[in-house]
A protein has these predicted regions:
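Glycine-rich, often acidic-flanked micro-motifs
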Residues: 2-21, 120, 124-134, 148-321
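Short charge-dense sequence patches
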Residues: 45-60, 90-96, 224, 237, ...
Length: 321
């Protein structure tokens, strides 16, 4: 970690993911001009319609520029495993890490031959069990709980996938787990935050150092998480029509190959790079997963007390392999 004295914050200088190393350098110099042949890959706006970010491919040799208006400019040389960051004044450390640990790592993994999935995962009974889903579906919370109840932490938020000899492997992710402060407290993850974690800020998550399971694991299941509203909320909404107790049970339903393929596409961690080579590799991998790996919808109560039942349901489901 490197301390930026002007901002009094700690920033990572090395990220390790999927057995690869990404070196990070921070600079105060003005970013160099974009090469003339740069290709704009993505442009996003915030909720107010203002420009939020832009991604460019600056060469065909694994060079990218990510410009985030609330963080800074990140020039990635994926082939050489290094990124140069020019940060904005008074930038939030959380904003910097969101870019580094999310889109920067996703581009880096793509150039290293991995397909990044927006998922968290554990190693359970020697196999990779992954959890995808919309923001707020509970991916990180579930992995945090499972990691303290018999499973081994594999990754949080970004799962590097690679196919080898017909087998899909889930590789270790970044050695960090990030939780919303209320979730961290309820799950008992307290007193272990990394230095520089600012859970008091609304935008910041509590960050916990975790050592991922060291070896890639064969992907046994990919669960699409869907939280059922808490009992109190359901009681209010179901008063007039009567509540169904079965609605609050853990439910696992396997998707057909077409549904699974579409769900995987929605869960990609990078939909910006659309070169023919990348799209061909992605489509082939997701089609193979949809045919050979069970992709299931997992519905469970939005209640931390239900997590033991979730683990039991997963263990029973894995016995069907």
């Amino acid at each position: 970690m490197k301390k930026d004295k002007s901002r009094n914050i700690l920033l990572p200088t090395i990220l390790r993911i999927a057995g690869e190393r990404l070196n990070i350098r921070y600079s105060r110099a003005t970013p160099p001009a974009l090469p003339k042949l740069s290709t704009l890959l993505r442009r996003t706006n915030d909720r107010g319609g203002r420009l939020a970010s832009r991604y460019w491919q600056t060469s065909s040799k694994g060079h990218y520029r990510l410009d985030w208006l609330d963080a800074g400019v990140f020039d990635l040389d994926a082939k050489r495993g290094k990124v140069t960051c020019v940060l904005n004044p008074d930038v939030s450390p959380g904003a910097v890490e969101e870019v580094l640990r999310g889109p920067v790592c996703a581009f880096f993994l793509l150039e290293r031959g991995f397909e990044p999935l927006h998922a968290s995962a554990v190693a359970l009974d020697g196999r990779c069990v992954a959890f995808a889903g919309a923001p707020g579906a509970g991916k990180s919370s579930l992995v945090a709980w499972l990691s303290r109840n018999g499973a081994k932490f594999l990754c949080d938020d970004i799962l590097p996938l690679r196919q080898n000899c017909g087998i899909v492997w889930g590789h270790p992710g970044l050695p960090q787990l990030r939780l919303e402060p209320p979730a961290a407290r309820k799950l008992g993850w307290r007193g272990r935050e990394e230095a520089g974690s600012s859970s008091s800020q609304l935008r910041e998550k509590s960050k916990f150092p975790v050592t991922p399971h060291g070896e890639p694991k064969r992907v046994a299941r990919i669960y699409l998480l869907e939280r059922i509203p808490s009992r109190k909320g359901r009681q209010r909404s179901n008063k007039s029509r009567g509540g169904n107790i079965q609605d609050r049970r853990v439910q696992i339903q396997r998707l057909g190959p077409r549904q699974a393929f579409r769900a995987l596409l929605k869960s990609t961690r990078n939909d910006s790079l659309d070169t023919p080579a990348r799209l061909r590799r992605q489509m082939n991998l997701f089609a193979h997963i949809a045919r050979t790996v069970p992709v299931c919808r997992l519905r469970y109560p939005h209640d931390y007390g239900a997590l033991p039942a979730v683990l039991e349901a997963i263990q029973q489901d894995l016995k069907l392999c």
